[in-house]
Curated annotation (Swiss-Prot):
One of its GO terms (biological process) is translation. It comes from Burkholderia mallei (strain ATCC 23344). One of its GO terms (cellular component) is cytosolic large ribosomal subunit. Belongs to the bacterial ribosomal protein bL27 family. It comes from the Bacteria. Keywords: Ribonucleoprotein, Ribosomal protein. This is Large ribosomal subunit protein bL27. Residues 1-21 are annotated as: Disordered. InterPro entries: Ribosomal_bL27, Ribosomal_bL27_CS. GO terms for molecular function: structural constituent of ribosome.
Length: 87
């Protein structure tokens, strides 16, 4: 009688799916209008010129151009700007 004893149960074995947050287009790279620049939780980075913010705080380009990351003010807030491409 070749029986196998029942395996014990484990309280592990779960993990949440990654949310794929972070910078999608880096400084100096070209981007088209509507392109996602940063996916984030909260305003870790703020929208500057030619950058819009979605309801989930995603930053996206409003015009075609190049991405530029800057820091502003005494608090050194990170701001994302899109420099428009020469028409």
């Amino acid at each position: 009688m070749a029986h196998k004893k029942a395996g014990g149960s484990s309280r592990n074995g779960r993990d949440s799916e990654s949310k794929r947050l972070g910078v999608k287009v880096y400084g100096g790279q070209a981007i088209n209008a509507g392109g996602i620049i940063v996916r984030q939780r909260g305003t870790r980075m703020h929208a500057g010129e030619n950058v819009g913010m979605g309801k989930d705080h995603t930053l996206f380009a409003l015009v075609d151009g190049h991405v530029k990351f800057t820091t502003k003010g005494a608090a050194k807030k990170h701001t994302v700007v899109v420099v428009p491409a020469a028409a």
